[in-house]
């Protein structure tokens, strides 16, 4: 499906780029430049991981060059089916999560990470309240995220302000006692409304959370979870009320772009070690304008399967070796979607350019007011 879509929209993307899109190498020094890559890795990948490092060096080089200000990640960094006891959670997160974070720290890259279901032990961990709580404590302790969010999600829900851009990271999982729910609770919503009001002068607002809200979405190698309540949820209604522009999410390991109520929901990310067609997003923000691009590239796998994946079948694991496909090596990633949002004199946001994944059949002008 991805290849057919790319073929159909390839010409539109080329025309879009020729029409004046500013490639990252030509971006202005004052631009805010970032990338987004959810669901990497979604497997227990060590640092270093034999057979992976050349491909990862290539990819992290791109993230660092194209998004020097920060990288967004909407969760699921490891498989993390560590359900034995809290001691196992502590031991394994210290091994794998700190290794993941070190990849960014070694390059002096800033990452803003939202918890995915795998940051609570996957769906199985979310069903065991005390195990999920142990994961949450470790996330707060180890991952080093901003601690300006609500007390019950400290270090897991937070915001950052970069010039005219507000970026909010949410935890789409709530402690409900015996198990965790797939929702955003009242404490987060109250904090979120205060954050929106305190930053009402932001020209653009991006929110990231692991679970998509508006369906249906494409899905592969995923439990296909969605936020409870969908577009009728308190979260969606609050984002509409305060003029959120973009909601970034993952979970489904496929690309789906939807626009509803003035919000662009972008589901993306892919399963490294299993899927051969991978993707990421890059963006830039300057006064009155935000540009987003979706990029895809291909890899190849070989060898056996990486161990240390409890509660998995013999082949339900990542492959031992990852290599860039020949075309990826020679040509780099291909742009398969591009979007430019511009703020007009009346405060409304116009879709001034769109192509590929973003070419949805909707009116070009979004009159959702900026709050």
Where are each of the predicted segments found?
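Short active-site segment of divalent metal-dependent hydrolases/proteases
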Residues: 42, 78-79, 119, 213, ...
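Extended active-site neighborhood of metal-dependent phosphoesterases/phosphodiesterases
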Residues: 47, 83-201, 224-229, 234-243, ...
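His/acidic metal-ligating clusters that form di-metal
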Residues: 58-70, 105, 110, 161, ...
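Short, solvent-exposed aromatic-acidic interface loops
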Residues: 294-304
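Active-site glycine-centered loops adjacent to acidic/histidine catalytic or metal-binding residues
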Residues: 39, 75-76, 116-117, 210, ...
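N-terminal active-site segment of His-dependent metallophosphoesterases
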Residues: 24-90
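Bacterial N-terminal signal peptides that target proteins for export
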Residues: 1-13
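C-terminal segment of classical bacterial N-terminal signal peptides
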Residues: 16-26
């Amino acid at each position: 499906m991805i290849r057919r879509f790319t073929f159909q929209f390839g010409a539109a993307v080329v025309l879009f780029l020729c029409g004046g899109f500013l490639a990252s190498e030509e971006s202005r020094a004052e631009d805010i430049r970032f990338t987004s890559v959810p669901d990497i890795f979604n497997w227990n990948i060590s640092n270093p991981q034999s057979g992976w490092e050349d491909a990862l060096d290539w990819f992290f080089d791109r993230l660092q060059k194209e998004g020097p200000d920060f990288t967004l990640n909407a969760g699921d960094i490891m498989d993390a089916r560590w359900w034995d006891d809290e001691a196992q959670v502590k031991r394994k997160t210290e091994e794998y999560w700190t290794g993941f974070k070190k990849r960014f720290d070694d390059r002096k890259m800033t990452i803003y990470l939202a918890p995915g279901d795998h940051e609570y032990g996957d769906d199985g961990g979310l069903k065991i309240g005390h195990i999920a709580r142990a994961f949450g404590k470790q996330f707060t302790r180890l991952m080093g995220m901003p601690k300006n969010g609500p007390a019950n999600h400290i270090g897991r829900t937070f915001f950052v302000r970069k010039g005219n851009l507000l970026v909010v990271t949410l935890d789409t999982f709530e402690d409900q006692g015996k198990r965790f729910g797939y929702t955003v609770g009242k404490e987060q919503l109250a904090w979120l409304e205060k954050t929106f009001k305190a930053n009402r002068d932001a020209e653009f607002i991006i929110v990231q959370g692991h679970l998509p809200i508006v369906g249906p979405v494409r899905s592969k190698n995923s439990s296909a979870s969605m936020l409870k309540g969908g577009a009728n949820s308190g979260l969606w209604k609050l984002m509409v009320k305060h003029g959120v522009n973009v909601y970034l999410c993952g979970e489904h390991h496929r690309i789906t772009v939807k626009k509803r109520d003035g919000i662009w929901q972008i589901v993306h990310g892919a399963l490294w070690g299993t899927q051969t067609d991978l993707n990421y997003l890059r963006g830039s923000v300057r006064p009155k304008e935000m540009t987003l691009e979706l990029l895809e590239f291909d890899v190849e796998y070989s060898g056996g399967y990486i161990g240390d994946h409890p509660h998995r079948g013999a082949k339900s694991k990542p492959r031992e070796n990852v290599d860039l496909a020949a075309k990826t090596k020679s040509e780099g990633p291909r742009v398969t979607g591009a979007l430019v949002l511009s703020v007009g004199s009346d405060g409304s946001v116009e879709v001034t350019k769109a192509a590929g994944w973003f070419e949805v059949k909707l009116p070009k002008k979004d009159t959702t007011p900026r709050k």
